[in-house]
Amino acid sequence: FGLTTATVYLSRFPGDKVGDDNAIPVSVVLLPDFSGMTQQQRLNPPAVELSATELTIPPIEEKAKKKLTVIVTNVGKSDLEITDLQVFNPALGVQLKKRVLKPGAKTKMKITAYGKYLNKVKGTPRVLMITNDPNCPKVIIKVNVTAK
């Protein structure tokens, strides 16, 4: 499960050089298959809830880093498993205390933005979380941040 990325390079003429100006990044997110769930599992699913799905950080210096915390809660009726946790680019780092949450349990997800990589980011930095919640298997947290 999770994020798979590749870069496709386009050319108009034979012999065109490969570079950032003719590169197209392609991303695919593979999600878990819930078709084999039993009736009991369907009636008592885990449910993920986040304290925030979009974070805003003021512009940071190139040599600086900024940490934020998101609280992940299981509001469902069975164990929530966080099977994959990935960032879309190197400008972010992510840490998670626990990957399995009992019903009602919480854990902290620490997201770090690194200033030295922000100038190379195209688009909005994001964190991808894959869970066994059949109603929300893919959670994306957007981090609005720029370099100073």
Please report, for each region that a protein language model flagged, where it lies by residue:
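Short, solvent-exposed loop/turn segments enriched in Ser/Thr/Gly
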Residues: 1-10, 21-23, 62-69, 116-128
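Long, low-complexity ectodomains and other extracytoplasmic segments of secretory-pathway proteins
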Residues: 11-71, 75-76, 133-148
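Beta-strand-rich interaction surfaces with strong enrichment in secreted/lumenal proteins
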Residues: 15, 58, 96-101, 114
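Alpha-helical transmembrane segments and membrane-interface helix-loop junctions
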Residues: 63, 105-108
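Surface-exposed binding patches on compact interaction domains or structured appendages
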Residues: 77-106
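Short, hydrophobic beta-strand segments
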Residues: 109-117
